[in-house]
Amino acid sequence: MSNIIKALEDEQLKQDLPKFAPGDTVVVQVKVKEGDRERLQAFEGVVIAIRNRGLHSAFTVRKISNGEGVERTFQTHSPVVNSIEVKRRGAVRRAKLYYLRERSGKSARIKEKLAKK
C-alpha cells in the first residue's frame, strides 16, 4: 500500500525547483485568483526556515513591508507556487533564522555567501 502512495507522491513532485537554503533572498511567484481571472504576485524576502518532507515540504519567507515584518509559508510543491528565483545567497550558520523576528535595521542584515573558486 505504501508503495502506491509513494508512487503517487513522486508523480506530483516539482522537478524544476532551484536549490535554496535559509538566508537566501528569493522571489516566489504566487498564483492569485481575483474573481474569474488569475495573475502572478511576487513575494520577495529572506528564507528563514525550510521543512523537508517530500511532497509536504514547505519554506517560510520573511520580508519587511511598510516597516512591518511579514512572513509567509509556502508549500514547495504546491500548484499555487509558480516559480522560485534565488536573488542572492546568504551566509548563515543556522537552519532556522527565527532570531531575525526580533531584529530590525542593520542587525537584521545577512552577509552574502561568496562563490567558491
UniProtKB/Swiss-Prot annotation:
Pfam families: Ribosomal_L19
GO cellular component terms given for this protein: cytosolic large ribosomal subunit
InterPro entries reported in the protein's UniProt record: Ribosomal_bL19, Ribosomal_bL19_CS, Ribosomal_bL19_sf, Translation_prot_SH3-like_sf
Gene3D superfamilies: 2.30.30.790
Stretch forming the signal peptide: none
Keywords: Ribonucleoprotein, Ribosomal protein
Gene Ontology BP terms: translation
The keyword Ribonucleoprotein is assigned to this record: yes
GO molecular function, one term: structural constituent of ribosome
Taxonomy, superkingdom: Bacteria
Record HAMAP family: Ribosomal_bL19
Function: This protein is located at the 30S-50S ribosomal subunit interface and may play a role in the structure and function of the aminoacyl-tRNA binding site.
Family listed: Belongs to the bacterial ribosomal protein bL19 family.
PANTHER family tied to this protein: LARGE RIBOSOMAL SUBUNIT PROTEIN BL19M, RIBOSOMAL PROTEIN L19
Protein name (database record): Large ribosomal subunit protein bL19
Organism annotation: Aliivibrio fischeri (strain ATCC 700601 / ES114)
